[in-house]
Amino acid sequence: MSSGRLLLGATPLGQPSDASPRLAAALATADVVAAEDTRRVRKLAKALDIRIGGRVVSLFDRVEALRVTALLDAINNGATVLVVSDAGTPVISDPGYRLVAACIDAGVSVTCLPGPSAVTTALVMSGLPAEKFCFEGFAPRKGAARRAWLAELAEERRTCVFFESPRRLAACLNDAVEQLGGARPAAICRELTKVHEEVVRGSLDELAIWAAGGVLGEITVVVAGAAPHAELSSLIAQVEEFVAAGIRVKDACSEVAAAHPGVRTRQLYDAVLQSRRETGGPAQP
């Protein structure tokens, strides 16, 4: 195995004092510091009163694939390479994955210097269940892709965490109301650990209204998982009760679905029609 090694250093989200002693030592002693933004890492070092001892190179998304060979060669020649992103932990929706994978394939030592992460910070501050969760990275930029992505998450039982641009937050929340249901609990975490840190909690309906006026800063969204479904037969029975009272099937399905987060109107409607076919009930709504 090479005598060199790869270090993954978690950097502060906003407060330089959140930097760990191990990160500070690595900044001072690493032979190469591969940074998502070289200006940001130099600014951090200055705030920590540290002189970066090694060579500083950029490692952002568009150049990572081009940097892997040279950085791996340096490690194989005995260098310690430190990877840092702008804020938080490298690799998690930030550069570093390709280099980590290449180092593992080459039998190179990979070590993480743990520390800040917007994902876990938002999760624990959200007030939502945290024993099981999933991280979805950045929400898709385009509306159609975003709605399809949210539709796939509609049945997810775990709490979901994802990043979103402040410019697209309002549109994303409106799509979430449509795909997940407006009653779904959620939290918007803004500017975590910074002077203007803010966590706004409420239903997706409430948060969509809040975001409509515009939001600034770094955004992490946390959304509760889907509630356990009531038995499908019970939901169908509730729909038929509404229908017996004179309500149209589609409207009855909407009413029942709205009362059970995670249940989608169209799926329930299809289930009602299927049940009617199987039991010889009226085929038409």
From Swiss-Prot:
It catalyses: cytidine(1402) in 16S rRNA + S-adenosyl-L-methionine = 2'-O-methylcytidine(1402) in 16S rRNA + S-adenosyl-L-homocysteine + H(+). Catalyzes the 2'-O-methylation of the ribose of cytidine 1402 (C1402) in 16S rRNA. It comes from Mycobacterium tuberculosis (strain ATCC 25618 / H37Rv). It is an enzyme of class 2 (transferase). The keyword Protein biosynthesis does not apply. Its EC number is 2.1.1.198. Pfam families: TP_methylase. This is Ribosomal RNA small subunit methyltransferase I. The keyword Signal does not apply. One of its GO terms (molecular function) is rRNA (cytosine-2'-O-)-methyltransferase activity. GO terms for cellular component: cytoplasm; plasma membrane. Induction: Up-regulated 34-fold 7 days after infection of human macrophages. Belongs to the methyltransferase superfamily. RsmI family. It is found in: Cytoplasm. Keywords: Cytoplasm, Methyltransferase, rRNA processing, S-adenosyl-L-methionine, Transferase.
